[in-house]
Amino acid sequence: MNGAIITDNERINIEPKDVMVKGSNKKQGVNAQTSTQRRPEHQGMAKVIINPGTPDFNRFLTARNGAVIRGFDDVSIAISSLFKTVDAVKHPDLVQAIQDWFNELHEENNKMKENLVAYIKSIEFDKNDSFMSSTQFVPFSFEPVQLNFNNHNTMRFYKYIFEMNQLMNTMYEYNSLGLLAVSDYPVMSHNIIKSINLYVENVKKTLNVSRRKDGPYSPAEFITKVMQYKSVQAYIAAEMSGKRR
């Protein structure tokens, strides 16, 4: 598929406003919601509602009794704890070193999204064709998934998930209409889900989330290592290169 991937701007017009970020509108101590998704620890956090658009993405998000969502939560907590622990006033260079690494992760995801958008734009069909103009695609309807966050880096990751879900939906529709090569949709669906899993794996391993003992996550070891090596990348190269992809 030439490494490319997804979009018809009329069908998928992704703008920042498309990310349905909602802040809590209830007063402190007032239980204004009875939803089981609303837990006390979500107070003071933003949330985004993702409506899975394809069976593949729905299976991914709901697999293993919610293990994927729990992994997202682990990453969100670790990122939030990390940036709350590091004093940006006393250690601006350390904060920047950590952010530089996150920027690299986000850039990798952005490249995949851009390739997908370019691929979708390249898909052409005759809008004057009477058969094509008579066809309609009936979208799937799955239970929505709520993701909670309170850090810029987690927001960027969840925005990527939100947008890739939309792009996969467009790919599925085009595939249903017979507009894609036979292997394009399954290959790209696999690659998108893999990219999301890879981000989670990289963050959990590098921030030592996967190796934490029972109890709340502490970023102390990671911070010590970054201060020692002066960058996250140098720390990974020196001590973790054999443990990663």
Where are these regions (language model features)?
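Polar/charged low-complexity regulatory segments
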Residues: M1-Y160, Q166, E173, H190-R245
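Conserved hydrophobic residue
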Residues: L179-L180
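Short hydrophobic alpha-helical segments that form membrane-spanning helices or hydrophobic packing faces
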Residues: D184-S189
